UniProtKB/Swiss-Prot annotation:
Keywords on record: Aminoacyl-tRNA synthetase, ATP-binding, Cytoplasm, Ligase, Nucleotide-binding, Protein biosynthesis
Listed EC numbers: 6.1.1.19
HAMAP family: Arg_tRNA_synth (MF_00123)
Protein source organism: Salmonella newport (strain SL254)
Name of this protein: Arginine--tRNA ligase
Main localization category: cytoplasm
GO BP of this protein: arginyl-tRNA aminoacylation
Subunit structure: Monomer.
Keyword Phosphoprotein: no
SUPFAM superfamilies: Anticodon-binding domain of a subclass of class I aminoacyl-tRNA synthetases, Arginyl-tRNA synthetase (ArgRS), N-terminal 'additional' domain, Nucleotidylyl transferase
């Protein structure tokens, strides 16, 4: 149940009945403060201005047409014309019952769409580093949310598996194999790439061979394709270990690398020329875009084919968008790529729209994100100033969590401790990132992310186990509880119930905006409200069985909401801590 949508519809009908235009926006929002009710309709100002009347006068007229019987206990006008809506306790009780009766907690399913989500995108023959973390986990949280809502989601892992560097890498792999050290060299991808580059820079004969190999690979030579495939396979096998550790849903089947679009590139260049969008300029093929200006104020030239016949990332991204619409039949495409790529993507998509490859009705959305910074406010690095490998970061998270868990549970069996440390350590790294607005840079801080206070994974995981512990102590007859009514008579019961019933609204925002931090803030709020409810509304020592069972049901919905919400973020919950 989406209460916000229900109220929006009711207020909108009342506004139209009061003389507002049919497309009026009621602007129903969740209230920021308890004294303003559960929801506020803020749309009177804008509409009253169009109608040439005072907002408060319009609000009064709207109230005469607004029928919220059975939904709201009180509706009042505040300030210049805000309408405050206080939900009826009996309505809240009924919605809590319905949510508990459903596996989906009463969350409705929107019209099913095919949504392509482009995320992670590491490079072949390189180990994943911290720079890949944000795209991977934010993209995966979006995917989980969209799938839960019932959409057909296609994960697209746009790996960097093509380019001139592959001549160098194949030549180096060949050299290692001749020395019977091929597999050993590939076990350390980072070292393999570094050694290949060193030889390429220092040995002219090796560099010449590498350049010839690029040509052979690009012409489809079987031997070189096999060597290339070996590099891709070994890299993706290593990456899969990282994905599994991160509890990310990507698999090998989701790889749609740059090489996939190679066969399309000549046709796209020819088509853009035929449509008069691309022209020859200084030997290269260029699309001039009025929408982007260079330093002189002239239309910016975007190169799609170099003088030597080579293609660019832009050409691949044009082909990629076309493929996602024509072949994958996407209704919507989301790209989780860092903010530095924004202009590049906008230029590619401007060409895509002008060429008619993807209609305007299909959104192409750049869900960009900021950087991960160290405590010094500079990009996160190792002590020696190098790039932090993702595997090393996860090892450290596990080690720190292990110490933390062992400290709190000295007698816990080793296997249980390891499982708990994994959930806490990996959860802490992910949640610290997901709980920040993705558009901003954020400071990576071990102490903060592993704290048991504040908006952190350990706090949320602990909050969940705390709710479960109520049930362990209660010794409940599940069937008797299922048929027990929900009674809401205390303010703290009403506040917790109202917030729990905003789960669908929260999912809707995350799905629309691609902002998992909204879910984190919601769950943290729920945990805080439960804490206040637990303190002031005795559950197991309630005055009678009816109140006890009703409060147990509120606790039950809290546990289910926390678990399901954390699951949409890819954060594991545990039964005990």
């Amino acid at each position: 149940m989406n209460i916000q949508a229900l109220l929006s519809e009711k207020v909108s009908q009342a506004m139209i009945a009061a003389g507002a235009p049919a497309d009026c926006e009621p602007q129903v929002r969740q209230s920021a403060k308890v004294q303003f009710g559960d929801y506020q309709a803020n749309g009177m100002m804008a509409v009253a201005k169009k109608l040439g009347m005072a907002p408060r006068q319009l609000a009064e007229q709207v109230l005469t047409h607004l029928d919220l019987s059975g939904i709201a206990s009180k509706v009042e006008i505040a300030g210049p014309g805000f309408i405050n809506i206080f939900l009826e306790p009996a309505f809240l009780a009924e919605q809590v019952q319905q949510a508990l009766a459903s596996d989906r907690l009463g969350v409705s399913q929107p019209t099913r769409q095919t949504i392509v989500v482009d995320y992670s995108a590491p490079n072949v023959a390189k180990e994943m580093h911290v720079g890949h973390l944000r795209s991977t986990i934010i993209g995966d949280a979006a995917v989980r949310t969209l799938e839960f809502l019932g959409h057909h989601v296609i994960r697209a892992n746009h790996v960097g598996d093509w380019g001139t560097q592959f001549g160098m890498l194949i030549a180096w792999l060949e050299k290692q194999q001749q020395e019977n050290a091929g597999d050993m060299a590939l076990a350390d991808l980072e070292g393999f790439y570094r050694d290949a580059k060193k030889h390429y820079d220092e040995d002219e004969a090796f560099a010449e061979r590498a350049r010839n190999y690029v040509v052979k690979l690009q012409s489809g030579d079987t031997y070189f394709r096999e060597m290339w495939r070996k590099l891709v396979d070994i890299t993706m096998t290593q990456n899969q270990i990282t994905y599994d550790r991160l509890n990310v849903t990507l698999t090998r089947d989701d790889v749609m690398g740059e090489s996939l679009y190679n066969p399309m590139l000549p046709g796209i260049v020819a088509d853009l020329k035929a449509k008069g969008l691309a022209v020859e300029s200084e030997g290269a093929t260029v699309v001039f875009l009025d929408e982007f200006k260079n330093k002189e104020g002239d239309p910016m030239g975007v190169i799609i084919q170099k003088k030597d016949g080579g293609y660019l990332y832009t050409t691949t991204d044009i082909a990629c968008a076309k493929y996602r619409y024509e072949t994958l039949h996407a209704d919507r495409v989301l790209y989780y790529i860092d903010s530095r790529q924004h202009q590049h993507l906008m230029q590619a998509w401007t060409i895509v729209r002008k060429a008619g490859y993807v209609p305007d009705s299909v959104p192409l959305e750049h869900h960009m994100f900021g950087m991960m910074l160290g405590k010094d406010g500079k990009p996160f690095k190792t002590r020696a100033g190098g790039t932090v490998k993702l595997a090393d970061l996860l090892d450290e998270a596990l080690e720190r969590a292990r110490r933390l868990v062992a400290e709190k549970n000295p007698d816990m069996p080793a296997d249980e401790l390891e499982k708990l440390a994994n959930a806490v350590g990996i959860g802490a790294v992910k949640y610290a990132d997901l709980s920040k607005n993705r558009t901003t840079d954020y400071i990576f801080d071990w102490d903060n992310m592993l704290a048991f206070e504040g908006n952190t994974a350990p706090y949320m995981q602990y909050a969940y186990t705390r709710v479960l512990s109520v049930f362990r102590k209660a010794d409940i007859d599940e069937q008797a509880l299922a048929s027990a009514p929900v009674i809401i008579s205390e303010d703290r019961e009403a506040q917790l119930a109202a917030r729990l019933l905003q789960f669908e609204e929260t999912l809707t925002v995350v799905a629309r905006e691609g902002t998992p931090h909204v879910m984190c803030a919601y769950l943290y709020d729920v945990a805080g409200l439960f804490s206040g409810f637990y303190e002031h509304c005795p559950i197991l020592s309630a005055e009678n069985d009816a109140v006890r069972n009703s409060r147990l049901k509120l606790a039950q919905l809290t546990a289910k909401t926390l678990k399901l919400g954390l699951d949409t973020l890819g954060i594991e919950t545990v039964e005990r801590m």
